[in-house]
Amino acid sequence: GLCPMIRLTHSVAIDMKTRLFITDIRKISFDRVGELSPERAERVQRCRRADDKLRCIAGGLFMNKFLGGAKITVNEFGKPECDNGLCFNISHSGSYVLFALSDSEVGCDIEEIRFLNGIRLGKIVFCDNEMKLLGNAFDRLGTFFELWTKKEALLKCMGDGFHRGAKSVDVSNGKFSENQTEYYMKQYKFSDYEISLCSVQNDFPKDIEFIIL
């Protein structure tokens, strides 16, 4: 699912590789909400479904663990920005929450692979090159989710989210260039999930790190 990309803007000397973490919300209890900031706890309370509450708690626990008490503000696109020099991004689907952490722009997306009409949906969100790739694919369902997660990770990395048209970016060859910035993408498989990570640096973690929060 789409969560906003979060950019931390304070100029701190940080030299770190991009890391990608995943956690299972079934290992989190509701009373962990007491560890969250008042703003995050209020957001948890606004969630109606139990699993949505747990996903929101997990996102807050990730931020606590890796960002400490960093101050978060929201820009004109609804993208949260933080003040300790790091960039991070959160995504969730099914029982899992994904957390990407870097010292440069980053976006991630996780989607549980489920049956759908990829061609019909693809016509709404994919550009011509992507539709050609999808139409020629042996595994159309898998290809749909590969393209979809790459596109969502890219848009989150760029900071535009879906305020711009999904067809305006082309992820068919695994990278995208705009305004003299190159965006690179890498894909990961995890159980029955498709995961994509996008970064302005072509230096990706080899593996996803599973973590119990």
What residue spans do the PLM features occupy?
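Core catalytic alpha/beta fold that binds nucleotide/phospho-ligands
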Residues: 6-213
